[in-house]
């Protein structure tokens, strides 16, 4: 049986990250804890005027091989693995003293190998051997030993000691043990991923494959969800171990009901779409598709234009802004429509105060950040599809005019706006746009011409005038029928990737209808 409270009399400290080290060592010494340490950690403690015993004095064996061997010794691992009541005699026979607390973080393999100029030799030298071994020994023996692996745990460690008269509870020891095993798993995964990607070792900086032979991923649980995609499915949200700044995983929920699986999926689509724009923008998403997108003079203007695209679909949608949300716009939204989630990089205090009148509305803050996800993944039966993220932008200079008529300056602006939106619409995707706002969106149809027709129907239902608008298509037109449908609706310019066997027919259709057409040479399928 695990004793609930066990005293801490002897601690071994060995850290690469010296953050908070002196403060922790000082606090432990003040509580009468004997300190053992190694190398640079011992020096830092000693320089702070604290008494510390070198591990070499405990083992009777000096550090050797440039520090590669220093703690791989029975006097250390016996002190960590010894079981109270079972191993007391053998420990006494061999003079092994119990170690009650291990404070250790590992060589910085991840940060070293993240550098573009990291050599294979640098990577190898930052593979910790003794550290993970000690962590595993201490974590396995949580019945008697506590282990801390990160400076963020120090405050909790000291608070627990103070609350229990210099002792640590079984629940604290177990929680720290789990954290230690998780850290070792993360560390080993990073090493495996790095070395599995190395394809050539003849250069100082090794050649590495984009997709390693083995992929080990680590995710940290953020929360349980109300349910999965449907109420009969359970769900949870996990984030990357090191989330990219500015992405959904960095959100803070300020109010509202529990988030659902669909809430987060839609929130990600809305946020990734809106953060493309520099000017104030609003994106309204329903079932992972933008149903209204606009750039405006401010939040209120952008919202009104986005909402007008498809007021019916906006009901119960997710609304995202790329600028801090003001109180006036928040009031208009919450007074007008039912909204599942509001997203913005920040909020005026008055906006948050007003949102409290609708307590169920989920309000998310996602701090600004220019980071982009490098990879996208999708589970298939017993497998994982992994690809580089579709972060490809487009500028006017990259567009190729293929029609007899060239777009006007205003049409070029609208074409690039529509192209940005089309990237976030489920394929087959068609976007009608004018004046930096969507006029109609046709999403997820098996036939491209039907997406074009639906975009026109959406515009008509919203009493929006298509005449003079532009059209974006996420992929090439296999036939001219999509161009014919667009021209009949009043479209005057088209942006599409090109690349169809019938490009000549499609271009001829554009010329026949007096449409300007540009090719991007880039496809934006989204499934």
From Swiss-Prot:
Species classification: Bacteria, Pseudomonadati, Pseudomonadota, Gammaproteobacteria, Lysobacterales
Keyword Ubl conjugation included in the entry's annotation: no
Keyword Transferase belongs to the record: yes
Annotated domain remarks: The IMP cyclohydrolase activity resides in the N-terminal region.
Pfam families (UniProt xref): AICARFT_IMPCHas, MGS
Residues of the MGS-like domain: 1-149
Catalysis performed (reactions): (6R)-10-formyltetrahydrofolate + 5-amino-1-(5-phospho-beta-D-ribosyl)imidazole-4-carboxamide = 5-formamido-1-(5-phospho-D-ribosyl)imidazole-4-carboxamide + (6S)-5,6,7,8-tetrahydrofolate; IMP + H2O = 5-formamido-1-(5-phospho-D-ribosyl)imidazole-4-carboxamide
Name of this chain's protein: Bifunctional purine biosynthesis protein PurH
Pathway: Purine metabolism; IMP biosynthesis via de novo pathway; 5-formamido-1-(5-phospho-D-ribosyl)imidazole-4-carboxamide from 5-amino-1-(5-phospho-D-ribosyl)imidazole-4-carboxamide (10-formyl THF route): step 1/1; Purine metabolism; IMP biosynthesis via de novo pathway; IMP from 5-formamido-1-(5-phospho-D-ribosyl)imidazole-4-carboxamide: step 1/1
